[in-house]
């Protein structure tokens, strides 16, 4: 496939009167802001002439200082996290231990003489980027497309949007980083192809399989690790230097490790005073990390159905490491594409998408996917999957549910995320209740539940009860994040326990059907005794006792067989009119509808 490289112009022609939106890559290590006009991209430089602005924030002399490599680092890793997760994750705790307010019930940091939430602190970085761009463009900026890791969940995405909003931005769209990178490559709209985007940033790793056809950039599958990136390579090298040369585990040693890593991308050895490390040693140190990324990429390819890929697109500064290119080629035997500066590919894509949203000039369309299945808890703890893993978004799905017991005046909805069959094994996202329903017999209420994921990956759930005209809607904003380790565990457990889960679900469904049948028939007998003789009532009770014994035995096959026996014998021996009533009850009709 022909690749069209988007080259940055020395001086793009941005007219003051035209509407402008920026693209922002809020990175773990570095952040960038760019604008596009007529498909020409310009990365905005900082006041000290840097395109890559370190994502660090310090507070000195009553002022925030951005990008001086001091103070709080890697704030991106904190988006969507709870205090409990921070305390239980050493890598995260080490980032914030000097700022953490452990007495708070939620995640707050002692910063700028205040207790601030993560979005409030991150907003200062967005403000800095905004100010730099406004100063150079001599215009106010209010609209932005912002990139996020493909595996950022609802909570993390919501906090990114909140931080940008605090900074004065209207977020036109959140776009997954691999998708933005593919867009930046400007794949020819008249060509077709399937690409693997390998995005190893400073603190996150994402991989996506994209199908590009006539301007449509469709994500088929996505995978990643929100706690793996180039910073982890730096840490491994730092540990080696500390152990080998008896150096302190300090910021200076970390900076030395980064310098060694960068030097060894184009040289065979690195020497600094009494410290030395060669390329072979470096590759031995980081090979386990690289192999982790390759495994994740292969999993993603399997999730996509193992399509033939036309190339691997490299994104992120860490991909300059020669070992990564070598291992990718070994694994996929396909061209490795790195035409665009890997540090800029994501922000270029965001800027191009921003331009296209405010002044459409191409027929391009970006379609992303949901990283995990979303569903709802039913009676008995069963999960009803409503939006499946890797479903293209935006999407809206409507399903109808009813009540299980008589005279319910409210329905509780429990929103879940995960691949398992039972609610206890999935992750709870949110709960809400539809109140004020008229008391009715079980099965009479009809509630329509709508799950909607927008283009930003934000989930909204609404419920509407037709008879009472009652409705309720929420935007799901869980107070916790979900990282790649948990996603992997969910998927692995779903695979390992698939048979157990399926059997558990079959049992629970059989029990629910049996209990509903027993309840309906016993009520029918009480209300329609004039239609039955004593012998017929005796036969019915005997058959119901068999069902009850099967339920007590917790044997789904026995339960199903006893239900079949009940239906068969009732059909053969009961009065025709009562038979019709029984059949209607078995179809879910209310007794008042059929009397």
Curated annotation (Swiss-Prot):
Does Membrane show up as a keyword for this record?
A: no
Q: Gene3D superfamilies in the record, alphabetically? A: 1.20.1270.10, 3.30.420.40, Actin, Chain A, domain 4, Substrate Binding Domain Of DNAk, Chain A, domain 1
Which SUPFAM superfamilies does its entry note? Actin-like ATPase domain, Heat shock protein 70kD (HSP70), C-terminal subdomain, Heat shock protein 70kD (HSP70), peptide-binding domain
Signal peptide: which range, if any?
A: none
Q: Which UniProt keywords apply?
A: ATP-binding, Chaperone, Nucleotide-binding
MF annotations from Gene Ontology: ATP binding; ATP hydrolysis activity; ATP-dependent protein folding chaperone; unfolded protein binding
Sorted alphabetically, the Gene Ontology BP terms of this entry are: iron-sulfur cluster assembly
HAMAP family, per the entry? HscA
Role summary: Chaperone involved in the maturation of iron-sulfur cluster-containing proteins. Has a low intrinsic ATPase activity which is markedly stimulated by HscB.
Q: Would you identify the family this protein belongs to, as annotated?
A: Belongs to the heat shock protein 70 family.
Protein name listed in UniProt:
Chaperone protein HscA homolog
- Natural source organism: Rickettsia peacockii (strain Rustic)
